[in-house]
Structure formats: structure tokens, C-alpha cells
Swiss-Prot record:
Keywords: Ribonucleoprotein, Ribosomal protein, RNA-binding, rRNA-binding. One of its GO terms (molecular function) is small ribosomal subunit rRNA binding. It comes from the Bacteria. InterPro entries: Ribosomal_bS18, Ribosomal_bS18_CS, Ribosomal_bS18_sf. Binds as a heterodimer with protein bS6 to the central domain of the 16S rRNA, where it helps stabilize the platform of the 30S subunit. Belongs to the bacterial ribosomal protein bS18 family. This is Small ribosomal subunit protein bS18. The keyword Transmembrane does not apply. Gene3D superfamilies: Ribosomal protein S18. GO terms for cellular component: cytosolic small ribosomal subunit. Part of the 30S ribosomal subunit. Forms a tight heterodimer with protein bS6. GO terms for biological process: translation.
């Protein structure tokens, strides 16, 4: 009989540490869109796997790009 239960989950690694990205630019829309849900919300750390340091920088960059109208506040 097969074991039932939770499937094995891999530990998520920080995207920015793996790709050696030091600075998150608010003008890099393609990068920022990876961390925004389809509803326009910023995805939490537990979903994306980013470290606390880069999550804070990512949040600031997303909010800046919204302020300058590069990203929408909500989904269309």
C-alpha cells in the first residue's frame, strides 16, 4: 500500500542569491512581474522563497515602480 500524506517539498532558494543579483532596480519590470500575483499583489516570502533582505528591497522596488506608473496597482 502506498504511503499517503504530504508530498516532498523542496526548499525554496532565494532567486537573487542564486543569480547573484545585488541591486533590484524598480525599472526592471520583467523581473518585478515574477514576484507579483495575477491580482497585482506582492507575493510573500513563503511563496517565492526570497530571503528577508531581498524581499524588503523587492517590496520597495515594486512600490516605487507603481508610484512612477510602470506597474499597475491592481490587475486589469
Amino acid at each position: 500500500m502506498a504511503r499517503k500524506g504530504r508530498p516532498n517539498k523542496r526548499r525554496k532558494v532565494c532567486f537573487f542569491k542564486v543569480n547573484k543579483i545585488k541591486h533590484i532596480d524598480y525599472k526592471d519590470i520583467d523581473l518585478l512581474k515574477k514576484f507579483i500575483s495575477e491580482r497585482g499583489k506582492i507575493l510573500p516570502r513563503r511563496v517565492t522563497g526570497t530571503s528577508a533582505k531581498y524581499q524588503r528591497a523587492l517590496t520597495i522596488a515594486i512600490k516605487r515602480s507603481r508610484q512612477v506608473a510602470l506597474l499597475p496597482y491592481t490587475a486589469e
